[in-house]
């Protein structure tokens, strides 16, 4: 699937060249494993790295609505399959390579299915444990996301 050209919608903020950018990073959990995706080569930031389902907080929608939309758009899991959403403690992730500070909102999303349909933003996915995730090339800061959600992930 080819990357669509980004055009901000009315009310949407373009953080592409901004110094600070608020983002969600969702860890999708099904039973005793969680989903990580390998980012597409066509993404502006961190192509090829493994990460949760992430997106800019770039409009005025509520957080739960934004989370459900990202999950549906990026991995094809509808809102009806989301069991719980839990928010972790927000943190800043400095990234000199992109001259950006990410304001990361860690989110745990428990789902009732492991059926995934990727969109263009990811080229691969795996359902993994903590130990399996550590062996992959993780997006900078994703280890902190996992740490801040660890008490819920390991249940």
Across the structure, where does each feature detected by a protein language model lie?
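Active-site-adjacent beta-strand/loop module that shapes the phosphate/pyrophosphate-binding cleft
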Residues: 30-32, 89-115
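NUDIX/MutT-family hydrolases
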Residues: 106, 117-148
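Helix N-cap/coil-helix junction residues
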Residues: 76-77, 138
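Acidic, metal-coordinating catalytic segment for phosphate/diphosphate chemistry
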Residues: 1-25
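A short coil-to-beta-strand element that immediately follows conserved catalytic motifs
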Residues: 78-88
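Conserved Nudix-box catalytic region and its N-terminal flanking loop in Nudix hydrolases
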Residues: 33-73
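Conserved hydrophobic "DFG−1" position in protein kinase catalytic cores
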Residues: 28-29, 36, 109, 127
């Amino acid at each position: 699937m080819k990357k669509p050209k980004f055009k901000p919608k009315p009310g949407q903020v373009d953080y592409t060249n901004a110094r600070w950018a608020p983002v969600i990073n969702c860890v999708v959990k099904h039973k005793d494993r969680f989903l990580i995706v390998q980012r597409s080569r066509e993404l502006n930031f961190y192509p090829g790295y493994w990460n949760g389902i992430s997106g800019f907080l770039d409009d005025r929608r509520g957080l739960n609505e934004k989370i459900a939309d990202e999950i549906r758009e990026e991995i094809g899991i509808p809102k009806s399959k989301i069991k719980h959403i839990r928010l972790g403690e927000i943190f800043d992730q400095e990234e000199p390579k992109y001259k950006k500070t990410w304001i990361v909102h860690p989110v745990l999303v428990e789902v009732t299915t492991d059926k995934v349909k990727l969109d263009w933003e990811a080229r691969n996915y795996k359902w993994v444990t903590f130990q399996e995730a550590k062996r992959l090339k993780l997006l900078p800061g994703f280890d902190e996301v996992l740490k801040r959600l660890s008490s819920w992930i390991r249940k």
